[in-house]
């Protein structure tokens, strides 16, 4: 089981939240890998949204950040026509799970289901004490 290093998965440490990329048991980071392949414009837009919410605690503009699943408390960052699923976790963390390019008015159910599964895996691995590296 490969644990990712802190400097790899932490996207931004703000005053209110620490924003992280979710990583799998094999160390893959789907959202980060997606972002790394995108244009500098997309990368900068997401970074600006993440910085704003991490430093100030909220993003009021629903065209940039909104809840997409009330039951599982899943959210999406919306830089340009890309969507990055995320969730809040205790300890003032926001975990970005996966991403996709939006092609229709509806949320991609397949990608949202992946995000839900990643959230469940995150919480299970955290409870088992096998998600973060040992200090």
Q: Predicted regions span which residues?
A:
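Short, conserved beta-strand/beta-arch hydrophobic-aromatic motifs that form part
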Residues: 98
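Basic, Lys/Arg-enriched alpha-helical interface segments
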Residues: 1-81, 91-93, 101-135
